[in-house]
Amino acid sequence: MTGDVPDRIKVLWFLPTHGDSRYLGTAEGGRSVDLPYLTQVAKAADTLGYYGVLLPTGRSCEDSWVIASALVPLTERLRFLVAVRPGLQSPTLAARMTATLDRISNGRLLINVVTGGDPLENKGDGIFLSHAERYEVTQEFLRIYKRVLSGETVEHQGKHLHIEDGRLLFPPVQTPYPPLYFGGSSDAGSTVAAQEIDKYLTWGEPPADVERKLDAVRELAEKAGRKLSFGIRLHVIARETTEEAWAAADRLISRLDDATIASAQKVFARMDSVGQARMSALHGGDRAKLEIAPNLWAGVGLVRGGAGTALVGDPDTIAERIDEYRRLGIDTFILSGYPHLEEAYRFGELVLPKLPTDHPVKATGSSVNTGPFGETIAGDHRPKSLASAS
């Protein structure tokens, strides 16, 4: 039932507000993630031509709204995908925050709707709702939130939320409101997406599994008289050769011991997120079962919650794998790599120019303007690129 195939795609990067490292599961190779570092990553993404950046949310992260507000004036075109949290925020407060950040960024805000899938973290935030109730709250929240941002005055008495004279005095730049992104693999999540959301997100499962998931959501949306677009969240390990890429993947988990893997998998098992369960099932915590589809590697998910798979390979191979997902109807790719500053450049230089993006990316020049101390050949002339020499 694959729907429309997009001709062009959007490619976003990721701001690691929860930490960054050269290795997973160890403090070795870790680096301080502070505002100067996040500024470097954001400016790199802006310069290289990524469409935007995703900011994660939760108690393991710096607050996404505060960080995005700090980085907006330091960037020019970059969009910021920031989370609203039904159950943690009132819909009218979230609408005011959304409108303000959209205005001060001149329309560079994207909204990620996050229901939350860790019962212990939810309790720490004062949320004692079941899985089904959280999605009920999410749907009520979104119906109020969208109406308020659209300029309506809202009176609402629902099962979970009660709003009187809910309205917005200062509207957002984007009309009727910034695009809404959402990921949810349960039946309840798929229903909310089909009825309320602009772009449905999936984590990086094998293409056949992704196709089935998107078809199910697409069918629900059609029944609701709506049409969605689709995005996917993946890590990437791109190198000039396939051999180098797989060596880099092995190196990323080379400091990871079995006890750390077991501890992480125990945490994931307590969650009631269907998406997290699907991620964990791809590898079962077993190092020997990490290539789950051609060039799709589940090593990140041994210890990282959420997105746990990476595309691994040379530039042409990764571009081909991305095109496989595009042909399933996906038009938005939210990517990351460890460490995020270096990998933003590596992917941005090796792969991004090969992709059919609908936003401008940094052009590969015919020569390199560097400096007088060795980069320029013999201090006499500039090296030409391989493309211009061919």
From Swiss-Prot:
Gene Ontology MF term list: alkanesulfonate monooxygenase activity
UniProt-listed GO biological process terms: alkanesulfonate catabolic process
UniProt-listed SUPFAM superfamilies: Bacterial luciferase-like
EC number(s) per entry: 1.14.14.5
Keyword Aminoacyl-tRNA synthetase tagged: no
Keyword Nuclease set for record: no
Enzyme class, broadest EC rank: oxidoreductase
Catalytic activity annotation: an alkanesulfonate + FMNH2 + O2 = an aldehyde + FMN + sulfite + H2O + 2 H(+)
Entry protein name: Alkanesulfonate monooxygenase 1
Pfam families in alphabetical order: Bac_luciferase
Disulfide bonds: none
Keyword terms, alphabetized: Flavoprotein, FMN, Monooxygenase, Oxidoreductase
Organism annotation: Mesorhizobium japonicum (strain LMG 29417 / CECT 9101 / MAFF 303099) (Mesorhizobium loti (strain MAFF 303099))
UniProt record similarity statement: Belongs to the SsuD family.
InterPro entries noted in UniProt: Alkanesulphonate_mOase_FMN-dep, Luciferase-like_dom, Luciferase-like_sf, SsuD_RutA_monooxygenase
Annotated stretches, region: Disordered: 364-390
Source organism, top-level taxon: Bacteria
Function statement: Catalyzes the desulfonation of aliphatic sulfonates.
